[in-house]
Design a protein with these regions (language model features):
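Generic N-terminal amphipathic, Lys/Arg-enriched alpha-helix
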Residues: 2, 10-29
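A short small-residue
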Residues: 18-23, 179-184, 218
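N-terminal glycine-rich anion-binding loops that anchor highly charged ligand groups
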Residues: 11-15, 41, 47, 52-60
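Short, surface-exposed alpha-helical recognition segments that flank or form part
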Residues: 26, 30-34, 189-192
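Alpha-helical packing segments of well-folded alpha/beta enzyme cores
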Residues: 35-38, 42, 201
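Active-site-proximal beta-alpha core segment in soluble small-molecule metabolic enzymes
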Residues: 51-214, 236-239
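C-terminal active-site-proximal or functional interface alpha/beta core segments in diverse enzymes
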Residues: 189-267
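Glycine-rich, proline-tolerant flexible connector loops at the mouths of alpha/beta enzymes
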Residues: 23-29, 56-65, 225
Length: 267
């Protein structure tokens, strides 16, 4: 049997007593109080560390709640043209776009919607970088830290054979157009895996700090789970900002909506 990732949910919470007959089926039901509490935690981390937190639309894109979300977060990250359009229309703030590959027919529109565009490889920077720069977007490169913290190999972006990001060992010089780096190698995890990953890549970051203006640590950080070490996170983000002289970003989806909603359905 294929191995599955365990749920991180803390239980039914307020939904334990929710009358499912009150709503149509199927539908998503959101606890707005719980959602706001999550957003307040994330905003506090941002304020304390100086890091900008973006909503990962691929994880939570209920745009009816965009007015609430954009009150607390700095923008959104998109994985393609339609998410970039959604971000522009409803969320405002900064828009970061990343995809393992971009379609040439869509790229102009994506570039004009985005503040940051993250490419998966130096080859993609060479192909689309000038186009992105002409549109006014800052250019980033996704790196593969080559440091695995994933519990399930098939979901691990650092697993052998992964094509998500450029392996650090293959990079001797960053493309000239690149002003920032992006990584995403965690999934619904605590602070310790992030700390170990940063420790693994920090020599590379220090070696290229003169070229870097920003660092995006991606998602997979379950910051709103009660046992997450938020003090440790703030210290780490602050240290990276100060020692590298960069703006630090996080892209969060599950942390935003963690234990704040249910899907009602029937068989």
């Amino acid at each position: 049997m294929s191995q599955l990732m365990p749920t991180q949910s803390q239980g039914a919470g307020n939904f334990a007593t929710f009358d499912l007959s009150r709503v149509p089926s199927p539908c998503f039901v959101v606890d707005e109080v719980a959602l706001r509490q999550n957003l307040e935690i994330l905003h506090a981390v941002s304020q304390a560390s100086g890091a900008e937190i973006l909503l990962a639309l691929k994880a939570f894109s209920m745009w009816s709640l965009a007015p609430l979300v954009r009150t607390y977060l700095s923008g959104a990250c998109a994985s393609g043209l339609w998410e970039a359009k959604l971000a522009k229309a409803h969320y405002g703030g900064q828009i970061t776009s990343y995809a393992p590959a971009f379609k040439a027919s869509e790229f102009d529109e994506i570039a004009n919607l985005s503040d940051h565009i993250v490419f998966n490889s130096p080859a993609q920077v060479a192909r689309f970088g000038a186009q992105a720069q002409q549109a006014g977007a800052a250019i980033g490169l996704r790196i593969n830290p080559q440091h695995s913290e994933g519990g399930v190999e098939k979901y691990d972006p650092c697993a052998a054979g992964s094509r998500l990001g450029q392996p650090l060992s293959d990079i001797t010089k960053l493309p000239d157009l690149v002003s920032g780096l992006h990584m995403h190698s965690l999934c619904e995890q605590g602070f310790a895996p992030l700390a170990r990953t940063v420790e693994a890549i920090e020599p590379f970051l220090q070696a290229h700090k003169q070229q870097l203006q920003w660092l995006n640590l991606g998602g997979g950080h379950l910051i709103t789970r009660p046992d997450y070490d938020r003090d440790g996170l703030v210290q780490l983000l602050t240290r990276l900002r100060d020692t590298l002289d960069v703006q630090v970003y996080l892209e969060l989806g599950t942390s935003v909506a963690f234990d704040a909603g249910i899907l009602v359905g029937e068989i």
